[in-house]
């Protein structure tokens, strides 16, 4: 596994001076726009993006619509053809001091998320996919659970939105790390959504961040590694993320994905269960491929 490198962020783009593009060695303060006073963020909403400027703007605006003052947004542009700052400029967000943007050559989602982790200053990392949005009460719900439980890792229910429907997807809760680990490896549908996860930054850093040796299933590997270290994510039974289903977020690389699953099962499953789990995973991936082939 390639370790998380806290002092090796590669920031190469030449950008307008008024845009905050930060190396980890030069952090800036977040300013409360109402009082113009510095605020140390509690939450760093981390977004990795490539070539989704319009969706990125929607994601960022959803964060600000929560009204939370102790939040920063860290955006890592992972080699977009059109730099993300152009979309931010068009949306009037270019000089917003709550946004911290790093543009870097394309190195993949794991490296982009590690860059965001290195730049972030909040106590908690809230992961947000660039095509997802937070609900207006997201931080109210997250704060309530974090204060009540002291949990270092939270996953949540979410809203799934299509052109014709909208529904809340309820996630299961688990009593122990081994129970959740088995579910992650065998359930046809993942028992968590990475977007919306909120993780104590120190815990995520101590785990080594994201595994840059993996190209896909990066979120799954991270959760499995946490579970192996006896960290049990706690479920928040409220949807805090709006997930808009569209063609570009449906995986069509089932064979590649199946190979990644085999590797994860070999790494994290008990030896006596590996063949059975691989059979379960093969059947579920073939079934999902069939659903994708005939259309949703």
What do the predicted segments below correspond to?
Residues 1-28, 266-296:
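Membrane-proximal basic amphipathic "stem/tether" segments
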Residues 239, 243-246, 252-276:
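Catalytic core of nucleotide-sugar-dependent glycosyltransferases
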Residues 155, 198-200, 204-210, 262-267, ...:
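Short secondary-structure transition/capping segments
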Residues 2-255:
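Nucleotide-sugar donor-binding/catalytic module of glycosyltransferases
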């Amino acid at each position: 596994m390639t370790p998380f490198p806290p002092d090796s962020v590669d920031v190469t783009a030449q950008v307008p001076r008024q845009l905050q593009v930060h190396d980890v060695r030069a952090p800036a303060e977040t300013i409360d726009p109402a009082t113009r006073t510095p605020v140390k963020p509690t939450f760093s909403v981390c977004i990795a993006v490539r070539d989704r400027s319009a969706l990125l703007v929607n994601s960022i605006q959803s964060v600000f619509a929560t009204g939370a003052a102790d939040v920063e947004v860290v955006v890592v542009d992972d080699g977009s053809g059109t730099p993300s700052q152009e979309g931010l400029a068009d949306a009037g967000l270019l000089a917003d001091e709550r946004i911290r943007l790093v543009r870097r050559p394309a190195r993949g989602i794991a490296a982009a998320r590690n860059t965001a982790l290195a730049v972030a200053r909040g106590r908690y990392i809230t992961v947000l996919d660039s095509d997802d949005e937070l609900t207006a009460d997201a931080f109210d719900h997250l704060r309530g659970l974090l204060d009540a439980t002291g949990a270092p890792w939270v996953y949540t229910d979410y809203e799934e939105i299509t052109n014709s429907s909208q529904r809340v997807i309820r996630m299961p809760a688990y009593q122990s790390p081994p129970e959740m680990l088995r579910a992650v490896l065998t359930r046809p549908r993942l028992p968590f959504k990475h977007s919306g996860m909120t993780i104590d930054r120190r815990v995520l850093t101590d785990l080594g961040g994201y595994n840059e040796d993996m190209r896909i299933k990066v979120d799954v590997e991270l959760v499995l590694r946490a579970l192996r270290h006896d960290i049990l994510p706690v479920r928040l039974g409220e949807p805090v993320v709006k997930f808009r289903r569209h063609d570009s977020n449906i995986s069509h690389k089932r064979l590649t994905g199946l190979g990644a699953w085999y590797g994860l099962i070999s790494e994290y499953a008990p030896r006596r269960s590996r063949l059975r789990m691989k059979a379960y995973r093969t059947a579920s991936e073939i079934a999902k491929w069939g659903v994708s082939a005939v259309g949703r």
